[in-house]
Amino acid sequence: MQHDLRFIPFRSPADAGWDEAWSLYRDSFPPCERRSAEHHIRALADPAFTADGIWLGDRLAGLLFHWRGEGFRYAEHLAVAPALRGHNIGSRALEAYCRSSDGPVVLEIEPPIEGMALRRLHFYRRLGFVENPCHYIHPSYEEPF
């Protein structure tokens, strides 16, 4: 599955593929790790925010929601369609995103204690990311915090 991936930003929920991307977002992240539809629409209006659909041909393969900061980019959410997982789509997408960045790319994961969090840590390490030793607590996107 070596077809080129394309990043096409969603500008509004009326864009083609948005409903599928929103379902993938909701299914891929627990409520405390995602914003509500209302808050997400507000984020779409922020010029520092981009909600990219990751396309493989005419098929939505995944999503990458990210922010541009001064001198860096923050990759907030990356998800791959369940039927396409295990085909290096996430790796290829994140590598392409990092190559296109004009500064360092930062991201975060939940504490890598077990299961999926450890898998994510190893995934990001394989792509060249390193851990920041600082302790922090990421507040929930929605109440209650």
Spell out what each predicted region is:
Residues M1-H39:
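Short amphipathic alpha-helix that is part of the acyltransferase structural core
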Residues A43-G53:
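A short helix-loop-beta-strand connector motif used in the catalytic cores of GNAT acetyltransferases and
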Residues G53, D58-R68, F72-A79:
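Conserved beta-strand in the GNAT
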Residues W67-E76, R85, G103, E142:
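A conserved beta-turn-beta hairpin within the catalytic core of GNAT-like acetyltransferases
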Residues V80, G86-R99:
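Conserved acetyl-CoA-binding loop-helix of GNAT-fold acetyltransferases
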Residues S100-G115:
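Conserved GNAT acetyl-CoA-binding A-motif
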Residues P111-C134, H138:
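Conserved active-site alpha-helix within GNAT-family acetyltransferase domains
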Residues P139-F145:
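Short, intrinsically disordered, charge-balanced linker/junction segments flanking boundaries
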